[in-house]
Amino acid sequence: LKSMDLHEYGKLQHQLAVDLDRNINIQWQKHAYPLIASFTYSVKEIEYMARVIDRTGGGKNTVVVISLGQHFRPFPIDVFIRRALNVHKAIQRLLMRSPDTMVIIKTENIREMHSDAERLSDFHGYIQNLVMMDIFQDLNVSIIDAWDITIAYGTNNVHPPQYVVGNQINIFLNYIC
């Protein structure tokens, strides 16, 4: 894969890697608000996930991976529910126009308990995790249960160590291969 420079500003810039010989195109982009970060980032590229999904053509060689969670913790649960429902509807539309598209939902990681526990604790994450499982249960999507994986490893880190992320990636690869 060759990483492409998209000439965007900040740490959370859109990422693109391609392999033209194998027809592989991997993209990553930050989600829209709420977006909590301790560094600067450009707001001009921010898009809601539902809009990005609606623009995705889909097909048997297309995999869409979505993760909702951490940045919603400090906000009322209805903000998270509304966003998850909008993503659910967008996935429904994607699967109607292109049923061979694979959609994978990655749950959030547990996190450390010493950083602003009142607003960011796993209590809020657990509720969001339950809500997400309920909202997406009727769709033909696969789940990477990062919540259970990070509990099993006892990492207590919003950005778990490489070996934990590696196991999450292995589950992803098992779904698509």
Regions found by a protein language model. Name each.
Residues 1-177:
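Extracellular glycan-modifying ectodomains
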